[in-house]
């Protein structure tokens, strides 16, 4: 089940105020929301606080809020706004993106050497993503990791779709350039 299809299941929370559905929604979205918040505030502890604040506010105001058409978009927009307000209140500007967490490869290596090579490739990918400029990295995370369309990412970040397109092109070119020497091609 994709994040978007999960989001559709949770829209009923607003109509019913069901605590069990709310808890499921928190469990489903919290990891990606924390990761996104961390890309704005710069560390995991503050990101956790931002996401918790968003969910607390949603629970407290559930009766007054019109159910959103797109729960995933609504949550990411709320986290973005809360994180930016958090930075303003604490007198800080956006500093850097947190470490990119690469999920464990689904490729099952057959020997220790393959495991080491896969780990090294993941480390190179992580380093390449970390080397992106902050805005470029944020867009890359939304589009490639969270599955947002270019248009959704543009709306969420208050940018034009063309800007998102340009930033994604830059991100992909920089990542491929950084990874070029480390990629193994096995065409026989």
Task: Label each residue range with its predicted role.
Residues 2-4, 12-13, 94-97, 155-156, ...:
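C-terminal edge and immediately downstream basic/flexible tail or linker adjoining helix-turn-helix-like DNA-binding
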Residues 15, 55-70, 89-91:
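Sigma70-family region 2
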């Amino acid at each position: 089940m994709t994040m978007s299809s999960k989001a559709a299941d949770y829209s009923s929370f607003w109509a019913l105020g069901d605590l069990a559905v709310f808890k499921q929604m928190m469990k489903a979205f919290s990891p990606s929301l924390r990761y996104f918040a961390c890309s704005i505030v710069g560390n995991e502890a503050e990101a956790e606080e931002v996401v918790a604040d968003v969910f607390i506010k949603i629970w407290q105001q559930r009766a007054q809020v019109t159910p959103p058409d797109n729960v995933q978009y609504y949550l990411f927009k709320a986290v973005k706004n809360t994180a930016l307000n958090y930075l303003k209140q604490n007198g800080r500007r956006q500093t850097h993106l947190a470490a990119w967490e690469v999920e464990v490869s689904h490729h099952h290596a057959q020997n220790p050497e393959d495991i080491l090579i896969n780990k090294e490739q993941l480390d190179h990918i992580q380093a390449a993503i970390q080397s992106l400029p902050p805005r470029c990295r944020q867009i890359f995370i939304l589009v490639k990791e969270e599955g947002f369309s270019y248009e959704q990412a543009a709306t969420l970040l208050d940018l034009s779709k063309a800007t998102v397109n340009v930033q994604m092109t830059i991100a992909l070119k920089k990542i491929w350039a950084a990874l070029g020497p480390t990629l193994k091609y096995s065409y026989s």
